[in-house]
């Protein structure tokens, strides 16, 4: 398009605005035809009231030549009143591919986020490295990876995948704290379908290789699957409500006014948990009954559902929640659930979020599949996470806690500051039936021969439950800080968090880093 020449100051501003408007109209035509928003529409939707300040819009472009800049839009704005840095790849410009200019803009934005100590959000929609720029484009990925690692644990980083994210580009979102995808248009993979077919002979579709369902249900790469772009962006805004701007400031604390609904839900929480340890229930209902306004933002709800993790507020204090889920695989721990819980605990610890753990676990999932999948190495990650955490940690045993799984689920011996149990909780090396079968093998064998097996087993199981699996043993030995009535659970958690508010969260030893089982 033509621009005033020579450009006066007023003419320059007018030309700049005209070029930007023309570029956005072109982007809208291309993206809307695919039922996708433009990069700048996405950022406007993300920031409060659509207000944000773009930086470097014409880097790599030319106002005189009538050409807008790179395939990345970047800037700053407020989310729920707090400053956040964000960028969005622009697929309407050279397929959103990344070259030197795009890499420089992303690195610069992350670097500013680090210096300003504010969260960083990246919206991915790119064809990958710009082939024409060769190794220069690849080197930019290395710079982005390094800068993302530098920001990790310092400021929250969230990725939203709203288009393709392929090749080496996938590792930048993987280095961030949370990844959100949309059901239809989001794809992440290291090698595309054509390369897979050429090298292995396997024919797969984009969805089969790296669609949102794959990464939310199976791989665990993603943390949430939204139906629309708007829902994905809104979910990220909700996440940020619970997170501090950086590790150097306290997590959000909101004014909470007690209300009859929360009080009634807390009093009735026992009704949600069956007394039989074999009967399933949805532990998320328990969580919602104990947190403010029943609001619980779950993370990775589709992956490893035998453990649930997420954020909530208790008396206005933002906390991380970890809980076994009896609705799925009886709440057992397996390789996926272990890694899911471990990384979440590490995140909470990095950003000073207190951790509330609800335990109802029968043990680790048995079988050759789990052993071959590395349950020893991968299960140990939960130990590392809880044992190294220095944030306030409160644990409540709801119904059962058996064996090694009890120990790793935020027990007092592994680092919980305060641990409680409901009166009917069973805490032991294993369940009563299994223990009785081992401890009284000979007696039961004799009873089987004389026809009194069932009566004998029932008697031995009852004896074991009375003498061993009740929480009194744990209280008397100091493994629990108290047995509480279910109706008092919420208030107990509130009182515990108030007590732990001044906890010294400094690491006990100075060292480079631990060498846990990554």
Feature roles, as predicted:
Residues 1-518:
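Ligand-binding clefts of soluble mixed alpha/beta catalytic domains
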């Amino acid at each position: 398009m033509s621009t005033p020449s020579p450009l006066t100051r007023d003419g320059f501003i007018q030309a700049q605005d005209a070029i930007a408007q023309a570029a956005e109209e072109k982007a809208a035509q291309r993206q809307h035809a695919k039922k996708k928003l433009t990069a700048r529409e996405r950022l406007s939707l993300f920031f409060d009231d659509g207000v944000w300040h773009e930086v470097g819009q014409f880097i790599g472009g030319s106002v005189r030549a009538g050409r807008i800049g790179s395939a990345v839009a970047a800037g700053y704005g407020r989310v729920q009143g707090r400053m956040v840095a964000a960028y969005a790849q622009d697929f309407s410009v050279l397929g959103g591919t990344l070259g030197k200019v795009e890499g420089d803009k992303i690195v610069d934005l992350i670097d500013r986020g680090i210096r300003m100590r504010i969260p960083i959000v990246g919206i991915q929609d790119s064809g990958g490295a710009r082939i024409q720029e060769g190794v220069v484009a690849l080197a930019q990925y290395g710079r982005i990876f390094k800068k993302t690692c530098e920001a990790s644990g310092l400021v929250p980083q969230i990725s939203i995948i709203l288009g393709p994210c392929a090749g080496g580009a996938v590792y930048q979102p993987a280095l961030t704290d949370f990844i959100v995808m949309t059901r239809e248009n989001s794809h992440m993979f290291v090698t595309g379908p054509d390369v897979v077919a050429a090298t292995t002979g396997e024919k797969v579709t984009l969805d089969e290789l790296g669609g949102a369902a794959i990464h939310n249900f199976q791989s665990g790469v993603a943390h949430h699957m939204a139906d629309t772009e708007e829902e994905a962006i809104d979910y990220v805004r909700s996440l940020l409500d619970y997170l501090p701007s950086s590790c150097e400031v306290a997590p959000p604390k909101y004014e909470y006014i007690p209300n009859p609904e929360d009080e009634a839900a807390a009093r009735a929480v026992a009704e949600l948990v069956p007394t039989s340890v074999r009967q399933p229930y949805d532990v998320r209902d328990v969580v919602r009954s104990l947190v403010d306004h029943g609001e619980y933002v779950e993370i990775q709800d589709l992956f490893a559902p035998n453990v649930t993790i997420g954020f909530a507020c208790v008396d206005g204090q933002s906390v991380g929640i970890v809980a076994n889920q009896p609705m799925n695989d009886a709440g057992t721990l397996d390789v996926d659930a272990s890694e899911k819980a471990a990384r979440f605990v590490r995140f909470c610890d990095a950003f000073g979020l207190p951790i509330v753990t609800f335990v109802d676990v029968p043990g680790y999932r048995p079988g050759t599949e789990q052993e071959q999948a590395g349950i020893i190495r991968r299960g140990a990650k939960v130990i590392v996470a809880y044992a190294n955490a220095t944030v306030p940690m409160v644990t409540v045993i709801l119904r059962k806690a058996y064996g090694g799984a009890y120990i790793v689920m935020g027990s007092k011996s592994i680092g919980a500051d305060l641990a409680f149990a409901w009166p009917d909780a069973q805490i032991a090396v294993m369940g009563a039936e299994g223990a009785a079968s081992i401890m009284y093998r000979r007696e039961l064998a004799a009873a089987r021969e004389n026809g009194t097996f069932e009566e004998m087993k029932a008697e031995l199981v009852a004896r074991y439950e009375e003498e061993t699996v009740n929480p009194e043993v744990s209280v008397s030995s100091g493994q629990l800080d108290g047995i509480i009535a279910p109706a008092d659970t919420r208030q107990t958690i509130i009182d515990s968090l108030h007590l732990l508010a001044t906890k010294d969260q400094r690491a006990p030893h100075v060292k480079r880093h631990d060498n846990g089982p990554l």
